[in-house]
């Protein structure tokens, strides 16, 4: 099972260090066999070398080694920090920052060429969801245009936009139906994200169509994230 915590723009270097130390100790003490990933804020990406049991990834990077891309991080900087995992296509970057499907695909191609583990996000708006399951699947598949679905280090996270940060997760029936339809087109792991928390993670991950979870705000407290790991 794959569990990934996305801190977004939360936590400082100090609090991230504290979080990772406690999480690493917990994973060691419980002999955790799950694959645990964490996407911290960019200023804490250098906590890679001495933290065991957790794979650290970047929430974003520009598809170039370096260059005149103000405010961005390139692969040259990530290489120095030994980062080999990246999150691409999150709805907040698509919606708030205007990242197009073409740009997400460009990022994918570039970081796939470098052998990165890629968490690639897809998800629909409430308007699309209300149009029915066929419209929902068409929309999500359109967000996979330009993505090599046979790439061996690809992990896809289905995150319905209307469930992200709202506290309202998709129903188990919606998750199961959507994952089953998407899996007909995929061979890679398919995670669920969207208001996953302590109260619903066990039942969501009990669905055979779900291979793990990408967790946002509910993962910000290390005690809660550890409890979620224990529940699966």
Curated annotation (Swiss-Prot):
The active site is at residues 90, 159. The keyword Isomerase applies. Coiled coil: none annotated. Pathway: Carbohydrate biosynthesis; gluconeogenesis; Carbohydrate degradation; glycolysis; D-glyceraldehyde 3-phosphate from glycerone phosphate: step 1/1. GO terms for biological process: gluconeogenesis; glyceraldehyde-3-phosphate biosynthetic process; glycerol catabolic process; glycolytic process. It catalyses: D-glyceraldehyde 3-phosphate = dihydroxyacetone phosphate. Gene3D superfamilies: Aldolase class I. The keyword Cytoplasm applies. Substrate binds at residues 6-8, 165, 195. Involved in the gluconeogenesis. Catalyzes stereospecifically the conversion of dihydroxyacetone phosphate (DHAP) to D-glyceraldehyde-3-phosphate (G3P). This is Triosephosphate isomerase.
């Amino acid at each position: 099972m794959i569990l990934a915590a996305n801190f977004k723009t939360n936590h400082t270097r100090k609090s991230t260090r504290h979080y990772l130390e406690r999480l690493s100790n917990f994973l060691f003490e419980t002999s955790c066999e799950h694959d645990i990933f964490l996407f911290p804020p960019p200023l804490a990406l250098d906590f890679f070398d001495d933290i065991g049991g957790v794979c650290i990834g970047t929430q974003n990077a520009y598809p170039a080694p370096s260059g005149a891309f103000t405010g961005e991080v390139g692969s040259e900087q990530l290489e120095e920090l030994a980062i080999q995992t990246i999150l691409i296509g999150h709805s907040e970057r698509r919606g708030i920052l205007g990242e197009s499907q073409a740009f997400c695909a460009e990022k994918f191609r570039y970081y796939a060429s470098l052998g990165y583990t890629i968490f690639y996000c897809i998800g629909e708006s409430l308007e699309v969801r209300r149009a029915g399951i066929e419209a929902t699947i068409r929309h999500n598949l359109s967000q996979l245009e330009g993505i090599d679905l046979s790439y061996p280090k690809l992990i896809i996270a289905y995150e319905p936009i209307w469930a992200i940060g709202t506290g309202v997760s998709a129903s188990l029936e919606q998750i199961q139906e959507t994952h089953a339809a998407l899996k007909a087109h995929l061979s890679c792991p398919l995670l669920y994200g969207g208001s996953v928390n302590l109260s619903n993670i066990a039942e969501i991950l009990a669905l055979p169509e779900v291979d793990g979870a990408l967790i946002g705000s509910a993962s910000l407290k290390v005690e809660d994230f550890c409890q979620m790991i224990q529940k699966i």
